[in-house]
């Protein structure tokens, strides 16, 4: 859904921060940094086009983090005389989504007689930094009944976004209330019983199965290595045993001290 707006970009129109979020340090709130992007422009030359648009232009992203597209302001300028007929439809598209109805984030229609127009879209969803760097947003423009010779630009579009950049979804300390609604209604758990709660979560069963599968694959690889390296001295064989298989894979899990340090740090 798109709504007409006037004037400059107002962050408060897209993000409603509570008093606690304004007062507390960033480590105690999921809102880390609110930013406005630089202006990105599209010069429309064809009656129907699907163009790439950089909605995060000038926004400093965080490695292995997230960015939430809270809002978008679109300004259009008709490069036509005042008495022209016709109009245009502008639609914001998320090109990752394969279903067309799910890919369209907001649309707007206006007549060519209105020289300048402006509207806002409120996507209000987050993507990973890795996806954001792939420039996942597009703009579908459909100009109708505007008679202009080919090669000229009847319409110019400018885009400015309001976004939230943050490193982690979870708050430090796990002092949030965790609700278990599977049996007998809500149950509030404190920090002391988080581990016990995790054992009851179905995802822990999936994780156990996943680790058992990776463990079996690792054992098979160990067997192949030991059979192929029988002529290798014992010292080299111990090195293969100590640094191969599951011990290497374990460094990629959350048990890694370096990963835990990054997750617990809160620079933003």
From Swiss-Prot:
It is found in: Host cytoplasm, Host cytoskeleton; Host cell junction, Host plasmodesma. GO terms for molecular function: double-stranded DNA binding; RNA binding. One of its GO terms (biological process) is transport of virus in host, cell to cell. One of its GO terms (cellular component) is host cell cytoplasm. Residues 215-243 are annotated as: Disordered. Its main location: host cell. Keywords: Host cell junction, Host cytoplasm, Host cytoskeleton, Host-virus interaction, RNA-binding, Transport, Viral movement protein. Signal peptide: none annotated. The keyword Transferase does not apply. Residues 225-237 have a biased composition (Polar residues). Binds to host RBCS at the plasmodesmata; this interaction seems required for viral systemic movement. In resistant plants, interacts with host MBP2C at host microtubules; this interaction prevents virus cell to cell movement. In resistant plants, interacts with host resistance (R) protein (e.g. tomato ToMV resistance protein TM-2(2), AC Q71BG9) at the host plasma membrane; this interaction triggers host defense responses leading to programmed cell death. Transports viral genome to neighboring plant cells directly through plasmosdesmata, without any budding. The movement protein allows efficient cell to cell propagation, by bypassing the host cell wall barrier. Forms a ribonucleoprotein complex with viral RNA. Binds microtubules and modulates microtubule stability. Can bind double-stranded DNA. Triggers host hypersensitive defense reaction in incompatible plants harboring resistance (R) proteins. Belongs to the tobamovirus movement protein family. This is Movement protein. It comes from Tobacco mosaic virus (strain B935A).
